[in-house]
């Protein structure tokens, strides 16, 4: 039997909730992975926002008479694969840069997920879910914008690991 529009929006919300809780766990790992107070502060801010996302999604599910699924969603599977691919950090400098890249990618994945939720919920006339999705999409866009310049900054910190060693890069 095919899903009703409400069942589908509930499934999308459950997937979004699973993604937000998975993102929270990933960001907690990024915080634990670094000793850099500036990165810890940025990731802590992202984590607070992500936890608030999960709470708002859960509240919307409850308003629809449903509960979070507790399962792992599509986004969690993608982030697990991204982590596997980028697990080769050789030192603290690489680890910081890679974790910033992963957090940036995560923000964009969530942004796309919320755009899909917005489009679908708008099409079925669920204005409350659409408004929530649009808000969350904007918050993830802002998070990505905060993270992007840090990629450049922290990629360059790897120079500190080779500074003074007499090794010069020549192209």
Language model features by range: what are they?
Residues 1-171:
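Amphipathic alpha-helical hairpins
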